[in-house]
């Protein structure tokens, strides 16, 4: 699994499952990413609030798709909505190493210990540890860290990995289909499987 430099870019992002899903189905129908980008600019296929927002969404969706082996497209199309949301989350983890580490350091550890919730104290420890490990994270403002945490919580909730309540959030161990498990292993993404299940 490739590790990218840490980035705080996710403060501008959403889970964008419906947009990701639409783009993947267009790929499955034979369109290229370049054609989808052009179509997005011309017709606002994601119903974005502005051309700038449409460009941001398309750029991020394309980046997530590019991060996965093309064989994920038929897997995505054949999966149920639960599986599709997991694949969207996996794409987020592949493109955002800081988010992957958040899941790996908090969700994986909690599940491995037999615990089924995490809270703000866990997030604070994560940021404290990362500030020691990375100058880039150390230079993030408190406001940026809070916005990143909000984004990460949204990703996990929208993917069905956690509940969405305020305060401590219950962790829901995902039921991952055998096809997705096999695909993750085949493409050296076992660390993501472990991060999401704790085993």
Where do the protein language model's features map onto the residues?
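Short acidic, glycine/proline-enriched loop segments that cap or flank alpha-helices
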Residues: 111-118, 136-144
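Helix-boundary capping/turn motifs
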Residues: 12-16, 31-32, 94-100, 126-130
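Leucine-rich, amphipathic alpha-helical/linker segments
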Residues: 9-10, 26, 92-93, 97-98, ...
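DNA-recognition alpha helix
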Residues: 119-135
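Accessory, usually C-terminal, subdomains that scaffold auxiliary metal cofactors
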Residues: 138-199
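Positively charged, polyanion-binding regions of nucleic-acid-associated proteins
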Residues: 87-90, 94-116
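Eukaryotic partner-binding/assembly regions in large regulatory complexes
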Residues: 1-86
């Amino acid at each position: 699994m490739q590790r990218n430099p840490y980035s705080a870019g996710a403060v501008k992002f959403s889970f964008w499952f419906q947009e990701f899903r639409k783009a993947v189905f267009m790929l499955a129908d034979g369109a290229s990413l370049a054609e989808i980008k052009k179509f997005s600019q011309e017709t606002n296929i994601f119903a974005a609030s502005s051309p700038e927002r449409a460009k941001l969404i398309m750029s991020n969706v394309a980046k997530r798709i590019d991060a996965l082996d093309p064989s994920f497209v038929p897997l995505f199309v054949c999966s149920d909505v639960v599986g599709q949301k997991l694949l969207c989350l996996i794409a987020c983890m592949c493109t955002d190493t800081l988010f992957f580490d958040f899941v790996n350091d908090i969700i994986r550890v909690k599940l491995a210990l037999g615990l089924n919730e995490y809270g703000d104290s866990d997030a604070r420890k994560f940021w404290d540890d990362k500030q020691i490990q990375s100058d880039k994270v150390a230079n993030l403002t408190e406001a940026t860290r809070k916005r990143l945490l909000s984004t990460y919580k949204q990703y996990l909730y929208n993917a069905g990995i956690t509940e969405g309540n305020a305060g401590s959030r219950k962790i829901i161990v995902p039921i991952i289909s055998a096809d997705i498990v096999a695909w993750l292993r085949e493409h050296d993404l076992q660390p993501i499987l472990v991060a999401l299940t704790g085993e």
